[in-house]
């Protein structure tokens, strides 16, 4: 057995959305007890541990999975890249994400988002920002993509573009998709970004 029954997947995903990670892990572990090499279950463990910020445990799970698949599974490579990002290992993360991106023909906005961030923080700022823009074109309703674009525009001192993205967020916040963070998180952060931009403009006027 390689897969998880659909009804159990729905239950696990619902528990993850409710942040009931321990309950989700219990269900996944019951599957792994019967089938220790169940690839979907191993991926679920990696994802849940990542959401719990248990990076080491998530790393072990995804390494085991990738070894089983000879490092040829885009989802496993994406998760491995994500975990390396959390450790600020931009070079290694970039390697895994690039392979995942190539295997999915650059069609997955989340892989593009993460790869773009890796390139940016590795020092290839223009290239990284370009991939974030591509991610936004593919899915303009992902709150994290919008948030990252605002961040990078501010870092690049492109305040007009940052403000445009802030306006976009405020206009579309009720229809945006949120995964690991809730709306309040983004509203608080983006409000601070907006105040920063206004302060910069005021400072420039006074100069």
What does each of the following model-derived ranges do?
Residues 1-5, 163-207:
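Terminal, low-structured helical/coil segments at or just beyond the last alpha-helical repeat
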Residues 40-44, 74-79, 109-114, 144-148, ...:
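Alpha-solenoid helical repeat scaffolds
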Residues 36, 70-71, 105-106, 140, ...:
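Short coil turns that delineate tetratricopeptide repeat
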Residues 28, 62-65, 97, 132, ...:
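Hydrophobic/aromatic packing residues within the alpha-helices of TPR/SEL1-like helical repeat arrays
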